[in-house]
Amino acid sequence: MKQLFTQHIKRLQQVVQTILETNFLSGLWIHSGTARYHFLDDQTAPFKINPHFNYLFPFPTAENCWLFLDGKNKPTVYFYAPNDYWHTPPVAPTDAFFADEFQWVILQDSQEIAKFIQNPTACTFIGEDENLAESLGFNQINPQKVLNQFHFERSIKSEFEIEAIYQAQFAALKGHQAAKQAFFEGKSEFEINLAYLKASQQSDLNVPYGNIVAINQHSAILHYTQLDYAPNPQQQSFLIDAGATIHGYASDITRTYAADPNSEFAAMIKQMEQYKYRIIDQLTVGVNYLSYHTQMQQWIAEMLYEYDFVRLTPEQIFEEGISRAFLPHGLGHLLGLQVHDAAGFQQNPRGTRKSPPEVYPSLRCTRDLAENMVLTIEPGFYFIDMLLNPLQNSPLARHINWQKIAEFKQFGGIRTEDNIVMRSQGAENLTQKAEIELQLSDH
C-alpha cells in the first residue's frame, strides 16, 4: 500500500495546487472533526471523520486533527494526542505506511493549533465546525467552489483507493458467509447480525452503515435496521446488506437467500443474480449510468411477465411504469470514503448538477461512466405494500395477478449487490474477485 499511497498523495498534491491557484489561495486547512455531544448530555455519538481529511490522511480515527497543504511542500499533519485517563489516548501512526508523506506535529492541547495557523484570511478551511473556523480567523469556510473540485476528484479513484475498497470486500464477505450460516441454522436477526460482526471483526460502531439483516417481509423495507431478537419459526427468506471499511473506504455487499432452494422464489433470486452479472458485463466507459438503470427496469418487466405477476407484455409493463413499483431504487451509486460517495450527480469540477429523471427519483448517479469510477450494482425486486396499493386502485389493477403477489409478500424482496471499478475495457468486479480468492464464488 505504501507505493500506491505515494502515487495517491502525489496526485492530490497536484489537485490541491490547482485548487489553490484557481481560487487565489495560499493554503488549505482541513479539520478532521470531533465527536458530537447528544442534546443535553455528556455522551457523544460515535466519531465520524471528515471525508476530505480521510481522503488525504487514511486514518479514520484521527479525531480533532488538522492538515495543512500548500500543494508544493510536504503536507503537515497536526495530530491531536492528549494525555487522558478517561479514554484510550490516541497514538500517532508515525510508523504507518503513509507516515513518510507527512510532516508531523503532535498536539497535546487542541488549542495549540492557533499558533500554527498563519494568515488564515489567505487560506480556506474545510470541516464541519464552522464556529471553530471563524474563531481562528478564517473567512473562506467550506467554499462551494473548492468542495466541488474535491468532490469531482473523489469520484475518480486512485489505485490506492481501489485497493482499499478491494481489501474491504474480504471482511464483508467473511461476515456474509457467517450470516448465511446463522440464517440456515434458524437464528434470529439479532443473532445473525452478531455472527456477521464477529466474522468480519467489526462492531456496530465502525461498520460503514447500519447492517440490514432482514428475514421474510422485513426484506421489503429497503433500509431495515431494527433487528428482531427472537427467531422466526417460519423463516422463508433472508436479505443481508452489509459492508466493511479499510482505511476509511467502504465495501457495500448484498445477498438474498431462500429457505427452500427449490422454490420459485429461489429461482427468482438466481435470475436476479444473472441480471446483475449481465449488466456488469455490459458496463462501458462513456455510457451514462441512467441507460443501465433503464435496462434493468426493462429486465424487471420481463421477470414480472415470466413469473406471471403481471399479465401484460414486458414492453407494456415497462411503458406503464409498473416495474418501478417492484424496483423503486436506483441500480447503484458511487462508492468510496462515503457509502453513497460524492459527486454522483456532479458532471464536472465546476459543480454542474444533473438531477435524476422524474420517473427515477431515487437514482443516485447520473454520470457518464469514467475509468476508475467505483460503483455498486444492486438490482432489486420487492413486494412493498406502499407501492403496490396505488396500482391496486388504478386501471392497471386488472392486469396484475394479485393472488400470486399476496403469496409472495411473505418473502419481502430480493437484492443482490456487488462493487465494481470501471476500467478502459469494461467493469472489474471487485466483489466477485474477492469471492474467487476466498473460494466462495460459483459464477
UniProtKB/Swiss-Prot annotation:
Entry keywords, A to Z: Dipeptidase, Hydrolase, Manganese, Metal-binding, Metalloprotease, Protease
Annotated positions binding Mn(2+) 1: 252, 333, 378, 417
Reaction catalysed by this enzyme: Xaa-L-Pro dipeptide + H2O = an L-alpha-amino acid + L-proline
Function of the protein: Splits dipeptides with a prolyl residue in the C-terminal position.
Originating species: Actinobacillus pleuropneumoniae serotype 5b (strain L20)
Membership in a protein family: Belongs to the peptidase M24B family. Bacterial-type prolidase subfamily.
InterPro entries on file: Creatin/AminoP/Spt16_N, Creatinase/aminopeptidase-like, PepQ_N, Pept_M24, Peptidase_M24B_aminopep-P_CS, X-Pro_dipept-like, X_Pro_dipept
GO cellular component terms attached to this protein's record: cytosol
Classification via PANTHER family: XAA-PRO AMINOPEPTIDASE 3, XAA-PRO DIPEPTIDASE
Record's protein name: Xaa-Pro dipeptidase
